[in-house]
């Protein structure tokens, strides 16, 4: 399993490309032939960038293009005069029907609900944890008077201030606010919003850098300096990092939107 942060490649092209490469490399160690079924994102510059990155990273000996009316030709053009990879064009079977947006959403909800059906809420202490996708927890927590000073500068309630390699990071309460963001930029602060973590879908990364499982953040507990995370994993003892996603979801699979 590889967690890239969301169910759509849009906004996560680098993560999707690297994760695909990692999974294919592992599969190659145990199989004579590996077939990579890529996503349906094929249109526009984003689709071309993602597919080109996967081809360059995977270096396949053959690319099989399933298309209806030549919609993949723009993706295939760079390989027209190259000796590798070979390109085989196939027509999509007439019986194949594209799923609607609602059908895709309903399927995701069922899959999430099934995955988290037996989830328990486990504790992840901040002292032994890092975050991927945020500067929070990367620095040194500053004394309380730094919070009061930051509140005066930013105009919001600040729960924690850290000194990171890039300056000061303020953990703010409430919802994201553009006025606060502008003030932070002017005053040299980086702002992370505590509300970001509510129901956030995360990847639980073990000490070897592998995705051990998924979780949903139930609470960022400032008093006890810990995250409470719903996950089907038996234990979080080997978890070293939370890879923060960009979507929020409930245990029953209901998607709450982007973080």
Whereabouts are the PLM-identified features?
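Nucleotide-state-sensitive switch-loop elements of NTP-binding domains
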Residues: 1-34, 42
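Phosphate/Mg2+-binding loops and adjacent switch elements
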Residues: 23-88
